[in-house]
């Protein structure tokens, strides 16, 4: 288990949401994992990446990393987490199928 995964198990919290103070004033929030420009009624709301600020506490940074890792693991292919031996077994099966298809001539129509 990687260091980031260990930290995620300790501190995994949803990202903070920065509500606008008013419809006419821009709001700067540091909770989104990427630079986002949202349009409100009359002025933009700027959300900067929390990962780019050095003054964040370890807990905040770990929580953001945890959320990113959690999202990545959800979107990953279900078989992507299998071990190396599974890849070797799959190679052997593929080679076996290819060998059988070469050894057996196709039936004539």
From Swiss-Prot:
The keyword Repeat applies. Sequence repeats lie at residues 21-29, 30-38, 39-47, 48-56, 57-65. GO terms for biological process: keratinization. Keywords: Cytoplasm, Keratinization, Repeat. It comes from the Eukaryota. Residues 21-65 are annotated as: 5 X 9 AA approximate tandem repeats. One of its GO terms (cellular component) is cytoplasm. It is found in: Cytoplasm. Signal peptide: none annotated. Residues 76-109 are annotated as: Disordered. Not expressed in uterus. Belongs to the cornifin (SPRR) family. Cross-linked envelope protein of keratinocytes. It is a keratinocyte protein that first appears in the cell cytosol, but ultimately becomes cross-linked to membrane proteins by transglutaminase. All that results in the formation of an insoluble envelope beneath the plasma membrane. This is Putative small proline-rich protein 2J. It comes from Mus musculus.
């Amino acid at each position: 288990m990687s260091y980031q995964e260990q930290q995620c198990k300790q501190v995994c919290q949803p990202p903070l949401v920065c509500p606008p103070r008013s419809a006419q004033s821009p709001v700067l929030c540091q909770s989104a994992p990427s630079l986002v420009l949202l349009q409100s009624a009359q002025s933009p709301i700027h959300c900067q990446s929390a990962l780019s600020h050095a003054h964040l506490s370890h807990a905040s940074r770990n929580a953001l990393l945890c959320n990113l890792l959690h999202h990545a693991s959800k979107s990953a292919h279900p078989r992507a987490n299998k071990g190396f031996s599974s890849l070797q077994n799959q190679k052997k099966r593929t080679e076996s199928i290819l060998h059988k298809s070469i050894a057996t001539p196709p039936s004539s129509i």
